[in-house]
């Protein structure tokens, strides 16, 4: 089975992006920490090249109860607990970007509901997509990740 899988993916090519001082990178992260976990090398490469970078977080990551329950040793989480968790995740994301020497003035938090985005799109697709589109159009990126 593994050899079959390896044969199937053998055609894949890894593309390493190149950046320069004219590059405008827009990184869209579903939650805080996704940018650091998935794209920190891309961010570092773009920063070294002098590219302009904006990071947009779609949610605050406030509705991920399992790590919060474990860390706080609290089973039932109130809305204020979740809001506090989202604020903590925002602060951690900004700290991670600062560690990469990133200008946090180029960070946007859309604050859309974590684990509620599908429902929001079903209820009010146009308004939701408008918020996301404005983050893209307002930046005029040359690359979107």
Which residues fall in each region the model found?
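Active-site beta-strand->loop->alpha-helix modules in alpha/beta enzyme cores, enriched
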Residues: 1-145
């Amino acid at each position: 089975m593994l050899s079959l899988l390896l044969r199937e993916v053998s055609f894949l090519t890894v593309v390493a992006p190149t950046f320069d001082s004219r590059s405008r990178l827009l990184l869209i992260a579903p939650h805080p920490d996704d940018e650091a976990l998935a794209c920190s090398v891309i961010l570092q490469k773009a920063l070294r090249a002098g590219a302009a970078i904006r990071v947009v977080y779609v949610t605050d990551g406030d509705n991920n109860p399992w790590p919060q329950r474990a860390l706080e040793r609290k089973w039932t989480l109130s809305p204020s607990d979740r809001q506090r968790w989202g604020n903590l995740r925002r602060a951690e994301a900004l700290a991670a970007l600062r560690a990469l020497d990133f200008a946090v003035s180029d960070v946007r938090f859309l604050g859309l509901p974590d684990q509620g985005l599908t429902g929001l799109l079903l209820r009010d697709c146009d308004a939701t997509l408008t918020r996301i589109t404005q983050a893209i159009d307002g930046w005029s990126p040359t690359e979107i990740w």
